[in-house]
Amino acid sequence: MRTATRARRHPGRGSTRTIAAIAAVGLVTACGSGGSGETSGETGAGGPDGVDDGTTLTMWTRAATQAQSEALVAAYNESHENQIELTVIPTDDYQAKVGAAAGSGELPDLFASDVVFVPNYTSSGLFTDLTDRIESLPYADALAPAHIDAGTFEGSKYVVPHTLDLSVLFYNKDLYAKAGLDPEQPPTTLAEWDQHARAIDALGDDVHGTFFGGNCGGCGVFTWWPSIWAAGEDVMNDDGTEANLASDVAQQVYDVYRGWAADDVTAPGARDETGTTWTGYFPEGNIGVMPMPSTTFGLMPDDLDFGVAPIPGPDGGESTFVGGDAIGISAASEHVDQAWNFLAWSLGDEAQIDVVAANGDVVARTDLASNKHSDADPRLVTVNELLASGRTPYSLNFGQTFNDPNGPWLTLMRDAVYGDETKLEENNEAVSSSLSS
């Protein structure tokens, strides 16, 4: 069964809290909550498709999603009068760059963002209100629900999906067969995943059951939280100010990972893995089953026989962390109708099928999960279908809490798997304090 995404309402926040949250992620902005984008939600003079009149548009994206952004921009520029000048900014510098540009009024017409940081921008008025434009699209209800939800602030929609990266279970079919497991039956519960990993690890030599980034907070939220969501639980409250990471279900998840660490079911290096190399182990063919980003699908060797599956919960269910980038029109743009022309085109059948799906990437629409490109490989359909049931967590203090190597989430992770597991409640309170600060 699939665990459905639940719609959430993100209550308004005072300007003091908004400014504090922006500072926490390295932004400096002079915009107040709502900004000039509040009154720009109407469809516009160009109709639902916007205006294509030869305008030059500026667009920013981070290096992590450079390939996908360049492919979309190249296809758009080739087929439209409007032309987009794309600037790719180093990922580690991106938030500071956006913040500085917001403060000086120099944001581009379009800018993408890691979807977990979108709430910081929407609550600070950096994006134009696109509510009416989005809802006028014939496939509006099929747009990646988690991205739309993350970009909704005080009832208005500010962004659309740009690039998608989902957490997915990868498993080695050859190792499954050698361990006496059915290569066509991936685990459907966390308990089965544990059993499969241990059976493969027992093969010995250089073969290992699984792997994970044990010193990587971002890896943890991306691959551990889906097991909690799959059980129908939340990891935070709706407005992202209180953690629920000490629940019985969460404890069950941590216990499995703790068992893998204690019994050396993981490949060497998991304890110290900071995320820089954690996806490089599985392609070598010596790992049985592990969760990874969907974007690694196309990087697998041609001779590696592997399958993909949803990340399961302790007793069943399935979910995924819907990451990647969302994109919107800056509140300072003087070319809203032209910028919308690009966004609307990027979500249409032509771009989603002939650019996104053709490159083996996850499509931004649930109604296109099965298409002429994904149908050639059922594994891609499996990944695409997860979009409908996945989640993107919402919190203004996400970065400082979960991505910062000195943040409280990594401490909770490390204690739960390698340290003093009795500190779980205490560590959960520390996460809540960071979220609400």
Give short role names for the model-derived ranges.
Residues 196-201, 239-270:
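Glycine-centered hinge/linker elements that transmit conformational signals in sensory
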Residues 115-166, 220-223, 307-309, 373-378, ...:
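Hinge/lid segment of periplasmic solute-binding proteins
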Residues 158-162, 167, 191-243, 287:
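Extracytoplasmic/periplasmic solute-binding protein
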Residues 357-407:
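Long, aromatic- and glycine/proline-rich binding clefts that accommodate carbohydrate-like moieties
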Residues 223-226, 254-335:
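Extracytoplasmic/periplasmic substrate-binding proteins
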Residues 2-24, 31-120, 135, 183, ...:
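Conserved N-terminal structural module of periplasmic/extracytoplasmic solute-binding proteins
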